[in-house]
């Protein structure tokens, strides 16, 4: 997640305030101050500071009772700053989310890792419809709670609701569930899921480029029903590269300092007034020494006689 990603002119964070003095129960302490003496209804505030990103125009709402160290106390966030936590750091944020001590939760965490509930959850909504998610390859993080696919059993819901009749889309787990050790020493687990479409009866499943990494705490490889988990969702724009794609020369097999080369040579001769032709296959074992020199062990096979001779060249 990046902040101020498209502007080079102004990196200052602008503070706006929305006043609501029409409500009789709201009182202002001072016009020059931003605090409120009474706020009986938490949904109604006389003065709500809003932080605006000068690049994208995104607005962050916060109240007077926000914890110290909120974004209104930050002078600016430079262009290119991204939210890209490691596996251990993800478990650290998840520990703070489930902890009863809310002081462990970073005051800005909801801006970077929003919480999805109910029908807006990951396993109910196509990733394209999730907030802030697009096919640009950037990663988005979410808190959510997995639910059971059926009332009985432990199988988790992976099916995504779609508007098209007869069309089925679901997340499919791939690979092994791997343990992750958090900074506090508590163990969690990570599993990778890939989105498949038309994954139903008598339909060929088609793999998409949507990928999800799901993290949960505990000592069990499977998360519990309703347990808070943290998932990061992204669209894989480039396929993974496995090894070098450099072409290997034909008829050459390298085994450390040894290589075999097959050389075919044709020879013509006359026998009884008739021209005949035979083909010899010369097999050479190339021994590459440490000083850069090479020795050649040649095996010459006469195809017409089926004989093979040996010759060593230095």
From Swiss-Prot:
Which Pfam families does the record match to this protein? NAM
Compositional bias (Polar residues) at which positions?
Answer: 18-39
**Annotated tissue distribution:** Expressed in protoxylem and elongating interfascicular fiber cells of elongating internodes, developing metaxylem cells and interfascicular fibers of non-elongating internodes and developing secondary xylem of roots.
Q: Where in the cell is it found?
A: Nucleus
Q: Does Nucleus count among this protein's keywords?
A: yes
Q: Which InterPro entries match?
A: NAC-dom (IPR003441), NAC_dom_sf (IPR036093), SOG1-like (IPR044799)
UniProt domain comment = The NAC domain includes a DNA binding domain and a dimerization domain.
> What is this protein's name?
NAC domain-containing protein 10
Q: Which organism is it from?
A: Arabidopsis thaliana
């Amino acid at each position: 997640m990046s902040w101020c990603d498209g502007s080079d002119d102004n990196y200052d964070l602008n503070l706006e305030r929305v006043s609501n003095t029409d409500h009789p129960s709201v009182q202002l302490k001072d016009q020059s101050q931003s605090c409120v003496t009474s706020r009986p209804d938490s949904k109604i505030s006389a003065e709500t500071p809003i932080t605006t990103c000068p690049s994208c125009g995104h607005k962050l709402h916060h109240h007077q009772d926000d914890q110290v160290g909120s974004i209104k106390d930050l002078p600016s966030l430079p262009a290119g700053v991204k939210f890209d936590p490691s596996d251990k750091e993800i478990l650290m944020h998840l520990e703070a989310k489930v902890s009863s001590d809310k002081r462990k939760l970073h005051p800005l965490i909801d801006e970077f890792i929003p919480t999805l509930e109910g029908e807006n959850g990951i396993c109910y909504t196509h990733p394209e419809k999730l907030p802030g998610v697009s096919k640009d390859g950037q990663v988005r993080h979410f808190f959510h709670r997995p639910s059971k696919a059926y009332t009985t059993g432990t199988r988790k819901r992976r099916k995504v609701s779609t508007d098209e009749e007869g069309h089925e889309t679901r997340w499919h787990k791939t690979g092994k569930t791997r343990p992750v050790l958090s900074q506090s020493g508590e163990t969690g687990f990570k599993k990778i899921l890939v989105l498949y479409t038309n994954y139903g009866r008598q339909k060929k499943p088609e793999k998409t480029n949507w990928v999800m990494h799901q993290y949960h705490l505990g000592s069990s490889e499977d998360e519990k029903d309703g347990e808070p988990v943290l998932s990061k969702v992204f669209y894989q724009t480039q396929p993974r590269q496995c090894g070098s794609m450099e072409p290997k020369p034909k008829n050459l097999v390298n085994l450390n300092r040894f290589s075999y080369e097959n050389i075919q040579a044709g020879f013509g001769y006359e026998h009884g007034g008739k021209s005949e032709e035979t083909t010899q296959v010369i097999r050479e074992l190339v021994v590459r020494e440490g000083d850069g020199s090479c020795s050649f062990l040649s095996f010459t096979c006469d195809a017409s006689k089926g004989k093979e001779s040996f010759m060593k060249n230095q």
